[in-house]
Amino acid sequence: MIGTPYTEGARRAMLLGCGELGKEVAIELQRLGVEVIGVDRYANAPAMQVAHRSHVINMLDAKALRAIIELEKPHLVIPEIEAIATQTLVEMEAEGVNIIPTARATKLTMDREGIRRLAAETLGLPTSPYFFCDTETEFNQAIREIGVPCVVKPVMSSSGKGQSVIRDIALSHKAWQYAQEGGRAGGGRVIVEGFVPFDYEITLLTVSAVNGIHFCAPIGHRQEDGDYRESWQPQAMSDEVLAKSQAIASKVVEALGGYGLFGVELFVKGHEVYFSEVSPRPHDTGLVTLISQDLSEFALHVRAILGLPIPNIHQHGPSASAVILAEGTSSNIRYQGIGAALEAVNTQLRLFAKPDIDGRRRLGVALARDIDIDSAISKALDSASKVKVIF
């Protein structure tokens, strides 16, 4: 049952994190009449602009997080970022608060160690070889054992922060320092992984709903500086590899538990599939589903967490997204060229309405459909290139 917002019978959902992905979740919640409360560390974040009301707190502050949940008494608490005091969510779930998909899933996936050990050691899924390191001495030993090239990541970071590929062991100290600077906790434990010479990597959006597990068509993507630049759907792959990918995703999602959409990241090398990471929430590469599917990843997430069925997921055809990226410092961001960016058929834009920029920031995305994937990517890139960010 869903009541009208601002009434006694309202269904209240609290978003912990109000970026561009949270904004789309908020919009989908609004479409189904849910009262939305946005929470983030800064004012006027994208999802706050479409929420019924919002609060600014440090979500890593356990007392502040508990206080805001107790104040608002939401029926659903929906973490949309990793930088949250997850132990508080675990405690509050035990007290009866509904954490999406589960507090355990949120805590496990907040750091790479929890989810990697679950996937490799508990579920026995294929992954790259790895070591976790607390000191630079352990780090150097791990590099010697795994060999180069290898990948280094802070166990707690996002959007590529602190990640690097070591191709020369002489550069290990620089990689260690970069990882320490990029961690959300300001340094600490890192993972050293063997480099998988993959043919391609995918995001398999996997939905756990009241009527079972559902899969979106696989999404291919290109990364640069640890963050995505373009994504496309569907990624071409054999039936055998798709079946292996879906089997891995099902095991991970079922082990994490709860209802919702999960972004399962996988590497594909020949006929082999390797687990990489998982997010228990919509994934940035899944922004392409805003144009590629009848139900976007955000609509699917909301249906699932509200306990609603998903009869089918229709994919419209070859589609792509291309990031609108800017670099600079400003609290007065404007955009030119929007008309030119939308001249081609089957193109759309999403401008995230982020309030400011200080450095490099993703400010929007261009979306396109075409007769094949290459054409869709080209069209999305062309559309994105026409949007000029003015400071």
Curated annotation (Swiss-Prot):
PROSITE patterns per UniProt: ATP_GRASP (PS50975)
Pathway(s) per entry: Purine metabolism; IMP biosynthesis via de novo pathway; N(2)-formyl-N(1)-(5-phospho-D-ribosyl)glycinamide from N(1)-(5-phospho-D-ribosyl)glycinamide (formate route): step 1/1
Catalytic activity: N(1)-(5-phospho-beta-D-ribosyl)glycinamide + formate + ATP = N(2)-formyl-N(1)-(5-phospho-beta-D-ribosyl)glycinamide + ADP + phosphate + H(+)
Residues in ATP-grasp domain copies: 117-306
Pfam families reported for this sequence: ATP-grasp, PurT_C, RS_preATP-grasp-like
Binding of Mg(2+), residues: E265, E277
One GO term (biological process): 'de novo' IMP biosynthetic process
Residue sites binding ATP per the record: R112, K153, S158, S159, G160, K161, G162, Q163, E193, G194, F195, V196, E201
GO annotations of cellular component type: cytosol
Keywords: ATP-binding, Ligase, Magnesium, Metal-binding, Nucleotide-binding, Purine biosynthesis
EC number(s) on file: 6.3.1.21
Molecular function GO labels: ATP binding; magnesium ion binding; phosphoribosylglycinamide formyltransferase 2 activity; phosphoribosylglycinamide formyltransferase activity
Subunit structure: Homodimer.
PANTHER family assigned: FORMATE-DEPENDENT PHOSPHORIBOSYLGLYCINAMIDE FORMYLTRANSFERASE
Cross-referenced HAMAP family: PurT
Its job: Involved in the de novo purine biosynthesis. Catalyzes the transfer of formate to 5-phospho-ribosyl-glycinamide (GAR), producing 5-phospho-ribosyl-N-formylglycinamide (FGAR). Formate is provided by PurU via hydrolysis of 10-formyl-tetrahydrofolate.
Protein name: Formate-dependent phosphoribosylglycinamide formyltransferase
Native source species: Shewanella putrefaciens (strain CN-32 / ATCC BAA-453)
